[in-house]
């Protein structure tokens, strides 16, 4: 409010102040650790031997209702991209809470350090895998942020990791949601770079010689999931450089 342009960083800092998230100082108006973000500490790459022992993600055997829906989708949308044979996402509140706690306990401590890192054949790494549960209202963003902050105060996760994760939720997720409610439906039709190329057909198959794109697309088709850095810096960035018409990416 009152600014000439929309920027996530302004929104993020205001939300931190308003809700008292990772704030300190006598008046509670200073960022914990003396800085608003820890991007410099959160850009490490894996060594030559790879990510090592990454904790297994929480998986859930599809129940009867989920199996029924899977069968329906396979019958009615058989020609659509993607597969359902490895579906193991949380579909209940209880399962979502298990996924959240597993992330906090096992992957949050290293999330920040490696949040921008990728490795071939490793779709899960130290990410939370909670986006679907949040979007389906199985988890509340406020409670997710609170649990992560509590882990920091308990000494179970370092500040750079917790701040990096909080920024993904309270920053990016809520910022984009805010843009949706303030600028849609017109925002969906914007094309500031006047881009008009078609999205390559192999985006729907993963059949490309470009390794990073192939890996990101293949896991998206297999699991319905790609982490934020794959979407931003691999599939999204390539489409941007190619000049793809925006609606072909998000339609």
Please place each PLM-identified region on the residue numbering.
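Beta-rich, aromatic/charged-enriched effector core domains that present basic-aromatic interfaces
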Residues: 1-89
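Conserved catalytic cores of very large enzyme subunits
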Residues: 92
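Gly/Thr-rich phosphate-binding loop signature of adenosyl cofactor/nucleotide-binding cores
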Residues: 96-101, 105-226, 241
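Alpha-helical support elements that line or immediately flank enzyme active sites
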Residues: 235-239
């Amino acid at each position: 409010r009152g600014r000439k342009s929309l920027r996530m960083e302004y929104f993020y800092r205001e939300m931190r102040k308003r809700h008292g998230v990772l704030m300190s100082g006598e008046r509670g108006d200073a960022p914990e650790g003396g800085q608003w973000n820890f991007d410099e500490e959160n850009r490490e790459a894996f060594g030559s031997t790879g990510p090592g022992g990454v904790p297994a993600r929480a998986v859930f055997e599809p129940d009867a209702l989920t199996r029924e829906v899977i069968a329906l989708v396979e019958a009615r949308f058989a020609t659509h991209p993607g597969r359902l044979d490895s579906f193991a996402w949380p579909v209940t509140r209880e399962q979502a809470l298990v996924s959240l706690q597993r992330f906090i306990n096992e992957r949050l401590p290293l999330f920040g350090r490696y949040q921008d890192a990728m490795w071939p054949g490793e779709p899960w790494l130290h990410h939370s895998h909670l986006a679907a549960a949040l979007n389906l209202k199985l988890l509340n963003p406020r409670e997710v942020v609170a649990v992560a902050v509590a882990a920091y105060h308990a000494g179970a996760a370092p500040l750079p990791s917790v701040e990096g994760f909080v920024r993904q939720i309270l920053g990016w997720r809520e910022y984009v949601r805010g843009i949706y409610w303030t600028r849609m439906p017109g925002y969906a039709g914007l094309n500031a770079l006047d881009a008009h190329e078609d999205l390559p057909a192999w985006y729907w198959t993963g059949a490309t010689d470009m390794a990073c794109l192939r890996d990101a697309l293949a896991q998206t088709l297999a699991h319905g999931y790609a982490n934020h850095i794959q979407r931003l810096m691999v599939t999204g960035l390539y489409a941007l450089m190619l000049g793809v018409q925006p609606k072909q990416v998000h339609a």
